[in-house]
Structure formats: structure tokens, C-alpha cells
């Protein structure tokens, strides 16, 4: 077994066990899943509901004044300003955005030096802001006069009293962690620990203390030991109560003068007013509710054709809850992990619903309801999950692999998408497995307990069928016989779920193939590939930076190549006209930036191993507050008991501040314990590795030509579309669509309704292998795959080789009275029979060319065996040349294997006069028996000893006398290995050797005859005419040799039974007896899976345990005698009776699963496949039923007398008999595949019985002859 097969087996077993667990304990699992959903959705309480997010309004800074308290526009006139923009805001927010870095970076610096010195400059900035005073003609104005004065914090925030300001201006900075004391900061050995000590230990999704003081999201601050960018960002937040334009302008000018930002291009032109809502409105809910209603309708109409579901609405609701809960869990977990998804985004919902939601739900439902309906609910759930386990896990692994590859592209946009997709996949998989599977098991259990016991007959529910061409005929009409041997009667399309409408076929095709998942996965791969290669912060830039850093020259060792003036314009606005990208000029080691003083450290201290990170400003820095949590500002004001509900705040333009620190400052600000740290500084990333936003004018923008990638993406999309069209063509178009001469007008064989596309079934004629050897009609047939045993009404048993058709042994009817008993009389009977037969070995030529009769040597016979016979040695004539030659036949016969010749087949020398004279001389009178009755075409009841005859007197043959048997005729017959078990009308059970023809053992005679037998392993069960059961066991006193096994198991069969040696002693013991199993004779007996099922004329069935004959259940559901029973290894039990009804039973619980009114008259034959129930009756009608729903799919009208001739070759192939022919049908669609005529001479003989062997052969009973037909090769390929 390969690794893939072992892995597949493990996954299947795990899903099987999970299905058993979910179906066994549904309520606890649903409660546990609900608690998990609530726990994962807890962070959503901190997120806004759809439609309740903050609303923004932008106004220019120039000439700004707070709006009046009352709106002055008329109600009917449109206004550019929103309704909430009335009066002064709660506060004005001014953020001073600081970007700081240590430049140049030395090799001996530590990772903690990246952020310790930049953070220490926050104290200086705060001091400069607090000391700023505006002096103008109106006087002086300080910060205390214009800022928002706050009082005490809320009583529950005692831990934050030393951090957040109280009784003064609301000013926030990272220095608040150390109470704005620089000495505390320098004395702190663990800065990161101090920053994170107030982080909540529980689930918390609102603004944290770190975000409030830093003013930027945590991942953008750069305060980490693992940061690649040696750039620290934070803000100093000022909250003003009044807007004072002059004070704000002077503060901005002073800070930009003290800390200039040469390459900054931030615009200070507009104010952003943010309004916070309080309650959700009905209008905002309409789009979301509409989306889920459409989803609910889609699932309902996709599952409404699934008949084995109790509540279609409930299933659709469970699917919607699954998808919705998956969406909510994904958003909640992503919010918990630091991502900030929004429920308003249109890109989240389609991915979760289409890719990981609906397809698995639909596939799981179809897989579970397609399991055998007679199984227990938990077994059906387990089998359904196990069958789809490999495809679910394979798709899951593929999607996770794509997401993992996308995450390592190092593109921030792709990484954020991949993180959200991983959480969505895992949450959806978690919900589908425990929750939806458990809900499905509850629904199927309700269906089993409620609906199936109350289901009306399907005929009572069928709508009247519309006539299509000719009237549909459900039953056989004796007055009008069809012109063709078969008439197909189909049910209406609403009840025939095998041929689905094209719309549903497309839906199930898309769900079964996971086409949507595959298309979106392919699109995701293409998108990730293009974005990863073309994005300036992607993998290509990272690899280029790594190669440059590992180069011995380094990037800083090379000066840019000068370009002669006049060749190309030096500063063309279009980068496509420049050979070199418009990068900022690289500095040599002895150069400094303009406006920056030279470093005092000299040449020795300026040596560094990597260039310093360049501080850049982009448009995204103007509105960095948008990346904060939407509850950032409400949380801050709520600490001081200020609510922002139905109010707004105004955000002023950001003041940029750039700080460049030299390595000496970093070394001076280092704590003594920092030198003991083992952390090494990470390698810097070039070009802004983690920054995917657009850059300013001074940022390097590489020329990107994406034409090649567009062409590749277009070609890939075209290929995917072509494959999709080909798949849809195979689904929608018929098999011979577009072929000439195949139109609907050219139909043969009587316009068969099953021929939907004008397909004409082929007709062939083959010469069968005819098995002849019985003088009367064959009543019993049995086979174990290698041997075939037949018994006729005369009591003669023939053993045939199922491969070659040779007659191996003939067991005679022991009807001749013997004076001796015991083994001698048996041997004598065998000896006399062999004198009459030819040993079963004949060539397939004409009968006249057959070899002389042969005799199986038995050794020297005992003298006492022939005491009652005359001495005929004097009659032996060795002069063969004088004998007349037999006339040759004019026409050849079909090839045959015969056990004896009929008198009309050949003529020979008449020995009657010689034998008669020898009898007279010995004083013996031969006895004659009456001629046998002509065979009856119908079922023949068991014959009594007085009714039975023997061989007719043949012309030219010795008149051996066969008296009526005292042992009774054969009523039942079974075969296993090389043992034949025979049940006689006298009540005697006999075990014969099929190869040697010897009687191995027998039981004592009982007054009641044996009507049915079961021979399974070493157990024999005999059902008697008085309703009793006898359980026998076979024992052998010689161990079996490992080589004593015949052949290999055939297709779909169990291993071949052992062959008992002739030296073994076989003993049959009676182990149990059930004296009153039924009140009337037992008419049907079957055994499988350790269970024995009996059917009787008392209208009941009983289920016994085979090992101890314990009666488990008595099944009552028929209103007539039981005529046929079916049971297999999967414990599928079906029964048919004289009332024409078919019942399906659950063997494990003894309950009736389904009840179907099948035929007008007795049900003569019954068999099942994995999805269908096939029945035949005396009305010569074969009906095929859906096993899960009990609805008739279609029926096949048989020839007169051929109603019981059917056999199942496989789950998809059915064979039926007709007048001298057999027909093969496709069980899935009811199509006639092929009709095989068995020669022209047998056309008038109906096939009364069909037995399917394991070697792809079929045995047809044509009265006293058997025909061995091999399945056509085209059908074997189809199977």
C-alpha cells in the first residue's frame, strides 16, 4: 500500500469516526459548537454593526469656522453638509507624527538601540509643545488656554491614573508610560515590557493603551526587537476644545523649523469631521438582509430535489447559519489577531460563501442521503462523510498551500488577505464538520422516524402522466401484446431523479467537481504571482536586497553612473524616458545630507555595514489615523466620561516631524543591561519592505512593464474557460449529439421510450453453450461460481463445470428398491447410472459423431451387488465391423454438453430382444414406469413420491426399472465448494460430493419435507413444510490442505469455499431446532451477515441469529404469503409477497423502512443494488425502484412467462430474459443496451430463470435445457 493510499485510508477512517460521534451525540455537539461560535464572535461586540460605522465629512482648513448650532438651510432644499454637521465638535484632534531613526547604523549597535533613543526624544518634544506660547497683538496664548481640560478618570480605571493625564490638558505621547519623566525612562531596563504591561490578558478588541499613547497601530510603530525597518513612528496627540487657527499655525511652524522634514510633501489643506452613530437603522440592514435571503433561496432550491431530507427549509437555514457563523467567526478571530476587517466590505462575503461555504454543504448532503436507506442513521452519516473525506481534505490542503505560498511573498496586501483566508477556511471547516453534519443527522433521523412509516403508496401520489406519442402503460395487458419483447414505462420527470434537468445537472456538476473553488484558487495563484513580482515591496525587491547586502562591494560602495548632459533629459516627468530610475542621490561616506551638520565622530566612528534607512513621507501618512480601530477615539473620551454617540470630532492636519539620531546618541542612551542582551540587530530591508503604500516623489519607483503578465494571465484565463466549456458540453449534450442519422425520427425496436436521444440498441446473435442432460423441466439451480448444479422434476442432479459447460457428475434418483442397504446400495445406484450415461463428456460436434459410452472405473465390484441381475456376458459382441453405420445429420446443432441422449436424437442397435431373452432365462420380469408428465411452463410445486416418474423407455436401450422413491423427491438444493446439500420431500437431508457423486452423509427422515435450504460456511439450515427450522453443522475429521481451494474469487464474490477431500469424513450434526418458527409452511429462506430470514405463508417474516437460532424480530407488513426474500452482507432486507407488495426492513431495529405496491399478483423475484430495488411478478413486469425514496423509477414489460427471469450483473447492469433472447439494461437510466438472441431454434422457448455467475457468465433455464451465455465484451467495458 502506497503512502497516498495509507493517508487516504487514515483520513477516511477519521471522518468515519467523526460521523459516528456527531450522529451519536447530536445535542452535546451542537451545544459545544454554539459555545465555540459565541466565543469566537465575542470580539464582534467591539466592532460596529453594518451601517453603524463612523461617517466622515471633509472641509477646507482655510477660512474654517465652526458651523452654527442651528441649520439655516430649508428642509426641502438639498444641502452639501450632512445633517449631523451642526454646532462645534466635541474636540479638535491634533496629531504630531514623529518618524525617527538612528543614522548611520553601526555594526556594534544592538536591536534595542533602534527604538530607545527615538523614544527618548518624545520627552523633549512634549516639553517644546507645552512651552510654546503665541504672542500677537491680542496678547499671549498658551497651550493650557486652548486645550481640552480633563478631570478625574472613571473609578474603574485606577491602574491608568499614573499613565493617562488628569486635571489638565489631554496630551498623549509614549512618554506617558513613564509619567513623562525622562529619568524613569533611562532607568527602565525593559522598555518593551513596560509598554506591554498594561495590555489586557483577556479578549479585548477595542483600542489598547499602547495604541492610545502611540497614536499609530502597533505594527507601524517599529518598537520591536524583530523589526526589519530601523524606523520608529509615533504621534503626540493634542486634544483642543476650541479651534484657534493662529496658535495651531505657530505651533506647526515652530516644530517644522526645529525638526525639518526635507522630503515631506504632506498637505495641510482639509479637516476631517468624524461622526459616530448610536443605533443601527433599518435602511442600512436592507442590503445585508437581501444578501442572506438570496443565499437562503439558493441553498433551498439546490437541495429541494434531495428527497431523503425531512425539512428542506431547515436544511437551507442550517446551511445559511453555517456560512454566516463562519463569516462572523472569521471576522471576530481576525479582529482578535490584530487585523481590522469590515463587515461592510464586499470582498469578504463572496469568498467565504462561494469558495468554502456552499459547495461542501451541498456535496456533504448529497453524499449522506445517497447512502443505503436501510442503514442506521449514524452509519449513513459516517459513510457519507467517509466517502467525501478525501476530496474535502485534498481541496483544503490545496487552498492552505496556496495561502501559505502567498503569505511568504512578503507583500503586505497578500499577507493580510492570506491571514484572513486561513481563518475563514479553518472556521468554515470547523462549522461544517461538527455543526452541519450533526444537524443533517438529526434531520435524517426525523425523516426515518416520521415520514417513512407514513409514506403513501407512490401510485397514489403520482400526477396523471401526459401522453407522449402513445399512451404510457404501467401494467401488462394480455389482450394486446407488444410488437417488441420489451416496453419501458417511465415515471414523470418529477419522480425520476436519475435523469435530472439540465439546470440541476449543471449545479450538481459544479458542486461535485468543486469548480468554483478550483477557478478561484487558480485566479488567486495568478493574482498572487503577478502582485508578488510587480509590487515594489514584494519578494523580488527583498531578494535583490539580500543579494546586494551579501555582495562584498555593498550598495554604498558604488557611486551612481553619471549620464552626459544633453543625451537624455535629466528630470523628465515620465520615468519611461529615463534609463535609470529617478532615485534619490546616494551619499558617499564623507558626505552628509543638506542642512545636516557633519558628524563629530570622525572617519573611524562612521564605518557601518549597511546604509541608513531613509525617512520618507507619503500620502498615506496624512491619514494614518484611519488605520486605528474605529473605537479608538470613543474609548479615549469614554475614560473621562465623555460620549461621542450622535456627536462628532474634528481631525486637524498632521504635523510631520523627522528625527535623525547619530550612533553616539544611541550609545549614550543605552541602559547598562542592554549590553548583556543577546539580541542581534536584524538586517534592514531596502526600499520599504513592509510598506506597501504609495511613495512620495523622492521614493524609488522602478519601471514596471506588466504587459507580459497581462498576456500570461489572459492566456491562463482562456485555457480555464475552454476546459469549463468542454466539461459543460459533456454534461449537457447527449452521447451522439451532432452525429448524422441519429435524429429523433430514426428510432427502432418499436419506438422505445427509453431511447431519449434516438439511440438504437444493438442486436446480436450468438451461439450459446447448451447444457442438455435432463429429461424433465429443471426445477432447482445452484452455483458457487465454479460449479453449476441443476435438478429436474425427475430428481436427477447434474453437476456442470461453469467454465467449460462439461457435465462432471450425475447423481441419480435413488428410486430403485434394493435388497441391500448402506454403502453398497449407493454404489450400485451409481454404477447403474453410469451404465446409462456417457459421463458428461461430449464433443461439440454432431450427436452421431459422439465417442462410445465410457465407464468410470470403480475397481472390482462385490459379487453381492449384482445378485438381482442376469448374466449378460454372452451378449457381448466384439465384431464391430458388422454393425451398421449411423446416418449423418443434414444440419448442425448448437454446441451442447449432454449427460444422456434422447431417443429422437440418434438411432442405434436394439438390444431389447437379447436383454428380454436373458431376463426370461433368469426368471426375472422387468418393471416399467409410467411416462413423465409434460413440463408445465409455470412454477411447479414440489412433487410427491407418487407423482414422480423416471426415465422414459428409450428405443434401443435396456429397460432399467426405476420404481417410485421411498426417499421422496428433491424440493431444495444448495451448493458450496464441492458439497451439494439436498432437501427431499420425505424430510431427509443429504450431503453429496459434487465431484465424486458419493453420498457423504444424511439425516434421519422427518414427516415434514424440506422446502428451503441455506448452506453458509459450515452451517446448514433446513426449513420444513410444517414451519419448523433445523440448524445443522458440518464437521470434518481431516484438516484441509492449503492447496485444496478451487479457483480465484470472481467479480463481486466472496472467497471460494474449500474443497473437501474424498478421504475426509463429513459428519452432519443437528445443533438447534426451532419447532414452531412459523404457523404455516416456510416458503422463503435467506441468510447473510450472521442473520437468517424466513418467510412463510402466515404473512410474516422472522429474523434469526445464525449462530444460536435465536429469534430476534418478527416482521409483519404483508397481507399475503411471503414469496421471496433478499438480504445481503450490508443487512439490506427486502421481502415480496402474494399481495404484490415489497417491504424494505431495517434488520438492526426490526422496523419497516418502506412499503411499495409493486405488482398485480405474486412477487416472484427480488434483488437489490446499492441504489435500486428490482422486482418481478406474475404480471410479467419488472419494476425498478429508488431504494432511498421508495419511488418507482421505471418498469420493463416482459414476455409471457419470463417475468421471473432477471439477474443483476453489477450495480449498473441488469439482464432479463425473453423469447429465446436475453437483454442488457442500464439500471441508472433504464436504457436498453443490447439484446442477444440465443440461436434461431430456441426463439420460441421463454427463459424461465436466469442465474448470474461470477465469471461474467449467465445461465438461462429453458425448460429441460440450460444455456450458458457470456456477457458481451462491450458490456464488460461499460461496467
From Swiss-Prot:
Region (Loop-1): 46-284
Residue ranges of the region described as Disordered: 60-81, 588-617, 668-696, 834-868, 883-903, 925-959
Membrane topology: Multi-pass membrane protein
Post-translational modification (record): Ubiquitinated at Lys-454 and Lys-466. RNF145 triggers ubiquitination of SCAP, likely inhibiting SCAP-SREBP complex transport to the Golgi apparatus and the subsequent processing/maturation of SREBF2/SREBP2.
Transmembrane segments: 19-39, 280-300, 313-333, 345-365, 402-422, 424-444, 519-539, 708-728
Cross-link (Glycyl lysine isopeptide (Lys-Gly) (interchain with G-Cter in ubiquitin)): 454, 466
Bias (Pro residues): 929-944
WD repeat coordinates: 770-810, 952-1002, 1005-1042, 1077-1114, 1117-1155, 1158-1195, 1197-1235
Parts forming coiled coils: none
Cytoplasmic side: 1-18, 301-312, 366-401, 445-518, 729-1279
Record's subcellular location: Endoplasmic reticulum membrane; Golgi apparatus membrane; Cytoplasmic vesicle, COPII-coated vesicle membrane
Renumbered ranges of motif ER export signal: 447-452
Positions of glycan attachment: 263, 590, 641
Presence of keyword Cell membrane: no
Domain of life from the UniProt record: Eukaryota
Assembly behavior: Membrane region forms a homotetramer. Component of the SCAP-SREBP complex (composed of SCAP and SREBF1/SREBP1 or SREBF2/SREBP2); interacts with SREBF1/SREBP1 or SREBF2/SREBP2 through its C-terminal cytoplasmic domain. Forms a ternary complex with INSIG1 or INSIG2 through its transmembrane domains at high sterol concentrations. Interacts with PAQR3; the interaction anchors the SCAP-SREBP complex to the Golgi apparatus in low cholesterol conditions. Interacts with the SEC23-SEC24 complex in a SAR1-GTP-dependent manner through an ER export signal in its third cytoplasmic loop.
Domain comment as written in the entry: Loop-1 binds to loop-7, enabling interaction with COPII-coated vesicles. When levels of cholesterol in the endoplasmic reticulum increase, Loop-1 binds to cholesterol instead, thereby disrupting direct binding between the two loops and preventing the SCAP-SREBP complex from exiting the endoplasmic reticulum.
Function summary: Escort protein required for cholesterol as well as lipid homeostasis. Regulates export of the SCAP-SREBP complex from the endoplasmic reticulum to the Golgi upon low cholesterol, thereby regulating the processing of sterol regulatory element-binding proteins (SREBPs) SREBF1/SREBP1 and SREBF2/SREBP2. At high sterol concentrations, formation of a ternary complex with INSIG (INSIG1 or INSIG2) leads to mask the ER export signal in SCAP, promoting retention of the complex in the endoplasmic reticulum.
Protein name: Sterol regulatory element-binding protein cleavage-activating protein
Source organism (scientific name): Sus scrofa (Pig)
Record lineage: Eukaryota, Metazoa, Chordata, Craniata, Vertebrata
Amino acid at each position: 500500500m502506497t503512502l497516498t493510499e495509507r493517508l487516504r485510508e487514515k483520513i477516511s477512517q477519521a471522518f468515519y469516526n467523526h460521523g459516528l460521534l456527531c450522529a451519536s451525540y447530536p445535542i452535546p455537539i451542537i451545544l459545544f459548537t454554539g459555545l465555540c461560535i459565541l466565543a469566537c464572535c465575542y470580539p464582534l461586540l467591539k466592532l460596529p454593526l453594518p451601517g453603524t460605522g463612523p461617517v466622515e465629512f471633509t472641509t477646507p482648513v482655510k477660512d474654517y469656522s465652526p458651523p452654527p448650532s442651528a441649520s439655516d438651510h430649508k428642509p426641502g432644499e438639498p444641502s452639501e453638509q450632512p445633517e449631523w454637521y451642526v454646532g462645534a465638535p466635541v474636540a479638535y484632534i491634533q496629531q504630531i507624527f514623529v518618524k525617527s531613526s538612528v543614522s548611520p547604523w553601526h555594526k556594534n549597535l544592538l536591536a534595542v538601540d533602534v527604538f530607545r533613543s527615538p523614544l527618548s526624544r518624545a520627552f523633549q518634544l512634549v516639553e517644546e509643545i507645552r512651552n510654546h506660547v503665541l504672542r500677537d497683538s491680542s496678547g499671549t496664548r498658551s497651550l493650557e488656554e486652548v486645550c481640552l481640560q480633563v478631570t478625574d478618570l472613571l473609578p474603574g480605571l485606577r491602574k491608568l491614573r499614573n499613565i493617562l493625564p488628569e486635571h489638565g490638558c489631554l496630551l498623549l505621547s509614549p512618554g506617558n508610560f513613564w509619567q513623562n519623566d525622562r529619568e524613569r525612562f533611562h532607568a527602565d531596563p525593559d522598555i518593551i515590557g513596560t509598554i506591554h504591561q498594561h495590555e489586557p490578558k483577556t479578549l479585548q478588541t477595542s483600542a489598547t493603551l499602547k495604541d492610545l499613547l502611540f497614536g499609530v497601530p502597533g505594527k507601524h510603530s517599529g518598537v520591536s526587537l524583530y523589526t526589519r525597518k530601523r524606523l520608529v513612528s509615533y504621534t503626540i496627540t493634542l486634544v483642543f476644545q476650541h479651534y484657534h487657527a493662529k496658535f495651531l499655525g505657530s505651533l506647526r511652524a515652530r516644530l517644522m523649523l526645529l525638526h525639518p522634514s526635507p522630503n515631506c510633501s504632506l498637505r495641510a489643506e482639509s479637516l476631517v469631521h468624524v461622526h459616530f452613530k448610536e443605533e443601527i437603522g433599518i435602511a442600512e440592514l436592507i442590503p445585508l438582509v437581501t444578501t442572506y435571503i438570496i443565499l437562503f433561496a439558493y441553498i433551498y432550491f439546490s437541495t429541494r430535489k434531495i428527497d431523503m431530507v425531512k425539512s428542506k427549509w431547515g436544511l437551507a437555514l442550517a446551511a445559511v447559519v453555517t456560512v454566516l457563523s463562519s463569516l462572523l467567526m472569521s471576522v471576530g478571530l481576525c479582529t482578535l489577531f490584530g487585523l481590522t476587517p469590515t463587515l461592510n466590505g464586499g470582498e469578504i462575503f463572496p469568498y467565504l460563501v462561494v469558495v468554502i461555504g456552499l459547495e461542501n454543504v451541498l456535496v456533504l448532503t448529497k453524499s449522506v442521503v445517497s447512502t443505503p436507506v436501510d442503514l442506521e442513521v449514524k452509519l449513513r452519516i459516517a459513510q457519507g462523510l467517509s466517502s467525501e473525506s478525501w476530496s474535502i481534505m485534498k481541496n483544503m490542503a490545496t487552498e492552505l498551500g496556496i495561502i501559505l505560498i502567498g503569505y511568504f511573498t512578503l507583500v503586505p496586501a497578500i499577507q493580510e488577505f492570506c491571514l484572513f483566508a486561513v481563518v475563514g477556511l479553518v472556521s468554515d471547516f470547523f462549522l461544517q464538520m461538527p455543526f452541519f453534519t450533526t444537524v443533517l443527522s438529526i434531520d435524517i433521523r426525523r425523516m426515518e422516524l416520521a415520514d417513512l412509516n407514513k409514506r403513501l403508496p407512490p401510485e397514489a401520489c403520482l400526477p396523471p402522466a401526459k401522453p407522449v406519442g402513445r399512451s404510457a402503460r404501467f401494467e401488462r395487458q394480455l389482450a394486446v401484446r407488444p410488437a417488441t419483447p420489451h416496453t419501458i414505462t417511465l415515471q414523470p420527470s418529477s419522480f425520476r431523479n436519475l435523469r435530472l434537468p439540465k439546470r440541476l445537472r449543471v449545479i450538481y456538476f459544479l458542486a461535485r467537481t468543486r469548480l468554483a473553488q478550483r477557478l478561484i484558487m487558480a485566479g488567486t495563484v495568478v493574482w498572487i504571482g503577478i502582485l508578488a513580482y510587480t509590487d515594489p515591496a514584494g519578494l523580488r525587491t527583498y531578494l535583490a536586497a539580500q543579494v546586494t547586502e551579501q555582495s562584498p562591494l555593498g550598495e554604498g560602495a558604488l557611486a551612481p553612473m553619471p549620464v552626459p548632459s544633453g543625451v537624455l533629459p535629466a528630470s523628465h516627468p515620465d520615468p519611461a524616458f529615463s534609463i535609470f530610475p529617478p532615485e534619490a542621490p546616494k551619499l558617499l561616506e564623507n558626505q552628509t545630507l543638506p542642512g545636516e551638520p557633519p558628524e563629530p565622530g570622525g572617519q573611524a566612528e562612521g564605518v557601518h555595514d549597511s546604509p541608513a534607512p531613509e525617512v520618507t513621507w507619503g500620502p498615506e501618512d496624512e491619514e494614518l489615523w484611519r488605520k486605528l480601530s474605529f473605537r479608538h477615539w470613543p474609548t479615549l473620551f469614554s475614560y473621562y466620561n465623555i460620549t461621542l454617540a450622535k456627536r462628532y470630532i474634528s481631525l486637524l492636519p498632521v504635523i510631520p516631524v523627522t528625527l535623525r539620531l547619530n550612533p553616539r546618541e544611541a550609545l549614550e542612551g543605552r541602559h547598562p543591561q542592554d549590553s548583556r542582551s543577546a539580541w542581534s540587530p536584524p538586517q534592514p530591508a531596502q526600499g520599504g519592505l513592509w510598506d506597501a503604500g504609495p511613495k512620495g516623489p523622492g521614493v524609488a519607483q522602478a519601471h514596471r512593464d506588466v504587459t507580459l503578465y497581462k498576456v500570461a494571465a489572459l492566456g491562463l484565463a482562456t485555457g480555464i474557460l475552454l476546459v469549463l466549456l468542454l466539461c459543460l458540453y459533456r454534461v449537457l449534450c447527449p452521447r451522439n449529439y451532432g452525429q448524422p442519422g441519429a435524429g429523433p425520427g430514426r428510432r427502432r425496436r418499436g419506438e422505445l421510450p427509453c431511447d431519449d436521444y434516438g439511440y438504437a440498441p444493438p442486436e446480436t446473435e450468438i451461439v450459446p453453450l447448451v447444457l442438455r442432460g435432463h429429461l424433465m423441466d429443471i426445477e432447482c439451480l445452484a452455483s458457487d461460481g465454479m460449479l453449476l448444479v441443476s435438478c429436474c422434476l425427475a430428481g436427477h442432479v447434474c453437476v456442470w463445470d461453469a467454465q467449460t459447460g462439461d457435465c462432471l457428475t450425475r447423481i441419480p434418483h435413488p428410486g430403485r428398491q434394493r435388497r441391500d442397504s448402506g454403502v453398497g446400495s449407493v454404489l450400485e445406484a451409481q454404477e447403474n447410472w453410469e451404465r446409462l450415461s456417457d459421463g458428461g463428456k461430449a464433443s461439440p460436434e454432431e450427436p452421431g459423431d459422439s465417442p462410445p459410452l465410457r465407464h468410470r472405473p470403480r475397481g472390482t465390484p462385490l459379487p453381492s451387488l449384482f445378485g438381482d441381475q442376469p448374466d449378460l456376458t454372452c451378449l457381448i459382441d466384439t465384431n464391430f465391423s458388422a454393425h451398421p453405420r449411423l446416418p449423418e445429420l443434414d444440419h448442425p446443432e448448437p454446441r451442447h454438453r449432454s449427460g444422456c441422449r434422447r431417443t429422437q436424437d440418434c438411432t442405434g442397435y436394439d438390444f431389447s430382444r437379447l436383454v428380454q431373452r436373458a431376463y426370461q432365462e433368469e426368471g426375472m420380469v422387468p418393471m416399467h414406469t409410467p411416462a413423465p408428465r409434460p413440463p408445465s411452463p409455470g412454477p411447479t410445486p414440489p412433487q410427491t413420491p407418487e407423482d414422480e416418474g423416471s426415465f422414459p423407455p428409450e428405443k434401443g436401450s435396456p429397460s432399467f426399472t426405476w420404481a417410485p422413491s421411498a426417499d421422496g423427491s428433491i424440493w431444495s438444493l444448495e451448493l458450496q465448494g464441492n458439497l451439494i446439500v439436498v432437501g427431499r420431500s420425505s424430510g431427509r437431508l443429504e450431503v453429496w460430493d459434487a465431484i465424486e457423486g458419493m453420498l457423504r452423509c444424511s439425516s434421519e427422515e422427518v414427516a415434514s419435507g424440506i422446502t428451503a435450504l441455506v448452506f453458509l460456511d459450515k452451517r446448514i439450515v433446513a426449513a420444513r413444510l410444517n414451519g419448523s427450522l433445523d440448524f445443522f453443522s458440518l464437521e470434518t475429521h481431516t484438516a484441509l490442505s492449503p492447496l485444496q481451494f478451487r479457483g480465484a474469487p470472481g467479480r463481486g464474490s466472496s472467497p471460494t469455499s474449500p474443497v473437501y477431500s474424498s478421504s475426509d469424513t463429513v459428519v452432519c450434526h443437528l445443533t438447534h431446532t426451532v419447532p414452531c418458527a412459523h404457523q404455516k409452511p416456510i416458503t422463503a429462506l435467506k441468510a447473510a451477515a450472521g442473520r437468517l430470514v424466513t418467510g412463510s405463508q402466515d404473512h410474516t417474516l422472522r429474523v434469526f441469529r445464525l449462530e444460536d437460532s435465536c429469534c430476534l424480530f418478527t416482521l409483519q407488513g404483508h397481507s399475503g404469503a411471503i414469496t421471496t426474500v433478499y438480504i445481503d452482507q450490508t443487512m439490506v432486507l427486502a421481502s415480496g409477497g402474494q399481495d404484490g407488495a415489497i417491504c424494505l426492513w431495517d434488520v438492526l431495529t426490526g422496523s419497516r423502512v418502506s412499503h411499495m405496491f409493486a405488482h398485480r399478483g405474486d412477487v416472484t423475484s427480488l434483488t437489490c443494488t446499492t441504489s435500486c430495488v428490482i422486482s418481478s411478478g406474475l404480471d410479467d413486469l419488472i419494476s425498478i425502484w429508488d431504494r432511498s425514496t421508495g419511488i418507482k423509477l421505471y418498469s420493463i414489460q416482459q414476455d409471457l412467462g419470463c417475468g421471473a427471469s432477471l439477474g443483476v450483473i453489477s450495480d449498473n447492469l441488469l439482464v432479463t430474459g425473453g423469447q429465446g433472447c436475453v437483454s442488457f439494461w442500464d439500471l441508472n437510466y433504464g436504457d436498453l443496451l443490447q439484446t442477444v438472441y440465443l440461436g434461431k431454434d430456441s426463439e420460441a422457448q421463454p427463459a424461465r430463470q436466469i442465474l448470474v455467475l461470477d465469471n461474467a457468465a449467465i445461465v438461462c433455464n429453458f425448460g429441460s435445457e440450460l444455456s450458458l451465455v457470456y456477457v458481451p465484451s462491450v458490456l464488460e467495458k461499460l461496467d
